[in-house]
UniProtKB/Swiss-Prot annotation:
Mg(2+) binds at D75, G104. It comes from Trypanosoma brucei brucei (strain 927/4 GUTat10.1). The keyword Cytoplasm applies. SUPFAM superfamilies: P-loop containing nucleoside triphosphate hydrolases (SSF52540). Belongs to the adenylosuccinate synthetase family. HAMAP family: Adenylosucc_synth (MF_00011). This is Adenylosuccinate synthetase. IMP binds at D75, E76, G77, K78, N102, A103, G104, H105, T189, K203, Q315, T331, K459. Parasitic protozoa lack the de novo purine biosynthesis pathway and rely exclusively on the salvage pathway for their purine nucleotide requirements. Substrate binds at A455, V456, T457, K458, K459, P460, R461. One of its GO terms (molecular function) is magnesium ion binding. Plays an important role in the salvage pathway for purine nucleotide biosynthesis. Catalyzes the first committed step in the biosynthesis of AMP from IMP. It is found in: Cytoplasm.
């Protein structure tokens, strides 16, 4: 563990090894009295495998609108559940209804070709589906054509009768440059999300229809919206050359975070002419651009015909801009289930709605900035050291995942002690490259072993424990159904930890007033208690219940026989998640393929 950053999360001089501040922190945390829930007996049910026809499909049959949404901080592995729902015979329409290309899903077709979708629904490869990008989405049409539609053109895969685009808000090059120039390191995907949503709410900028209509109106709207861009350059004292140089610096490690056409915009002398020409040639007159339609009307008509609709949720509940707890470090759209339904513009009184929450464990993760009480290291640990990709992690360090996880759960967690309070000791793990704080070692090893990097950003994700405190609220708002992906990772663990509470501690003895409650050192926040705002969560540390793993009894699809009884450790893990969150686990992931799902008898 490491000392928490302040509410504004400034950079810290983090170390690889255990430092004096971590030892001082643990000196206090080890005195926290154990909470009764650590020793509370949880009934271990016998969970049995069942077919998709007997589990998921009956749920779909009872509803008209199905939503698959993230339950943590994104990157939960939603695509697999989306694919499973989309294959239901009556599910004919799949839609993205808000947010933009800051989501990422990797899908493989029947012959193993890889496709990466950021804005297009990930069910584009699913037979007999019509896929929609709705009008409340934000789209960079140039990136959309290059990165997403270009995959279909290259592989000669038809898409014109499967994909339809509404009157989306257009993300321009200057929105992406505003994002680059105005964002703190690691705080953004650089996809222009905050700037385009600012244009949206101030009724500036353009929508897709503007590109296909009067050029004079298009030019006028672009010119008005670009005042913000020119204003930022003036305030920061930047020239076009400075902006180009900043773009080149961002791309210097070989990852193209700023596309070439955005850099060309920064170079362009007449930027309005550049944009009009760009959109005329590559959108308006582009025969490969997908068909356009009134998406809301089409989806309502499909529902009226008795067809079922799947709404594919981008990001997640806790990354929703409509949730106060992590508001400063969220995306710019309401990515909760309620937000999706509102963006889809349906009469919610008319239809039965099914929400399937998706979480991931072990190795629950987050990218970007913000609080993350259940993480192995502070959320800004990598960005503070300018680590942008997995390749930039310490060379040769923390590569023995098995040794590290064993040390973590058997040494740092002294579960045999009568005074064990669920807080691990900041011991040091040592390998040939040096000494590492065990939280740092576990974070690096998890990122390496599980390939945890952002689907969009390529940044290492910060891993940690399954957080029952946060999921209790998710379940209360949009539960109870939960699919947990990547559970086969547990095949490599001797034990598994889940967060069942937090303890608040600030080294300066500072208190935080959140919604009228004052949080002070030693305060416990349990699953089911009000979740405080991020100002308090920066100073919260996980109280972890350690449960038995199932190493030696793998559930990975490549090693397990179908319908083989689930190991006791898996059942114990699921039972504890259900007990502390109130969720109902309907499936667990056990491999990389779309079909690698174990459905649980309900």
């Amino acid at each position: 563990m490491a000392a928490a950053p302040s509410a504004t999360a400034p950079k810290h001089n983090y170390t690889l090894g255990t430092n004096a501040s971590q030892l001082e922190l643990y000196k206090y945390l080890k005195t926290v009295p154990p909470i009764p829930e650590l020793r509370q007996a949880v009934t271990i049910k016998k969970y049995e495998e069942a077919s998709v026809d007997d589990t998921l499909y009956p749920l779909i049959d009872e509803h008209q609108i199905i939503m698959v949404v993230g339950a943590f901080f994104g990157d939960e592995g939603k695509g697999k559940t989306v694919d499973a729902v989309a294959r239901h015979p009556a599910c004919t329409c799949v839609a993205r209804v808000n947010s933009g290309e800051n989501a990422g899903h990797t899908v493989f077709d029947d012959i193993g070709r890889k496709y990466v979708f950021n804005l297009a629904p990930s069910s584009l490869l699913t037979p007999n589906t019509r896929n929609y990008v709705s009008s409340e989405c934000v789209m960079d049409p140039i990136s959309f054509m290059e990165r997403e539609i270009g995959q279909f053109i290259k592989s000669n895969m038809p898409y014109k009768d499967k994909l339809f685009v509404g009157n989306v808000f257009v993300v321009t090059p200057y929105h992406k440059l505003l994002d680059l120039l105005g964002s703190a390191p690691n705080s953004s995907t650089l996809k222009g999300m905050s700037p385009i949503h600012a244009s949206k709410v101030t009724k500036r900028g353009i929508r897709l229809d503007h590109i296909f209509n009067d050029e004079g109106v298009l030019r006028a709207r672009l010119a008005k919206d670009m005042d913000t861009y020119y204003g930022l350059l003036k305030v920061k004292g930047l020239t076009d050359k400075d902006v180009v140089r900043r773009c080149q610096e961002e791309n210097a490690d070989g990852v193209e975070r700023v596309p070439g056409y955005v850099v060309d915009f920064a170079r362009a002398e007449n930027k309005i002419d550049y944009l009009v020409k760009l959109y005329t040639e590559r959108v308006k007159n582009n025969k490969d651009f997908p068909r356009r339609c009134d998406v809301t009307h089409e989806l309502r008509a499909a529902l009226a015909r008795g067809e079922k609709l799947l709404l594919e949720g981008p990001q997640s509940y806790w990354l929703s801009n409509a949730r106060e707890k992590f508001w400063e470090s969220t995306t710019s759209a309401d990515t909760t289930a309620g937000g999706l339904l509102a963006s889809a513009q349906f009469n919610f009184q008319r239809y039965k709605v099914l929400v399937i929450n998706v979480h991931k464990a072990p190795g629950s993760s987050r990218v970007g900035i913000g609080a993350n009480p259940s993480s192995f290291v502070p959320q800004d640990y990598y960005s503070a050291q300018d680590i942008k990709t997995l390749e930039a992690l310490p060379k040769g360090g923390c590569v023995d995942f098995d040794k590290i996880q064993n040390f973590f759960y058997t040494k740092a967690f002294n579960t045999e002690s009568k005074t064990f309070n669920g807080i691990y000791e900041p011991l040091e793990y040592e390998d040939a490259t040096g000494k590492y704080n065990i939280g740092v070692a576990m974070s690096i090893a998890s990122a390496r072993h599980h390939g945890e990097c952002g689907a969009v950003t390529k940044k290492p994700r910060v891993c940690g424990f399954f957080d029952c405190v946060l999921h209790f609220e998710v379940n209360a708002v949009q539960g109870p159904y939960l699919s947990i992906s990547a559970v086969d990772r547990g095949d490599d663990y001797d034990r598994i930890g889940i967060t069942i509470a937090y303890v608040y501690y600030d080294v300066g003895n500072k208190m935080v007033d959140a919604n009228g409650r004052v949080y002070k050192n030693g305060d416990i926040i349990k699953a089911g208690d009000p979740v405080p705002c991020e100002m308090a969560l920066y100073h919260c540390y996980p109280i972890v219940k350690v449960i038995n793993g199932w190493k030696g009894a793998p559930i990975a699809a490549s090693k397990r026989r179908p319908n083989e009884p689930l190991p006791k450790g898996v059942c114990e893990f699921i039972a504890n998640v259900e007990f502390f969150t109130g969720a109902k686990v309907i499936s667990i992931g056990n491999g990389p393929r779309g079909s690698d799902i174990i459905y649980l008898k309900q």
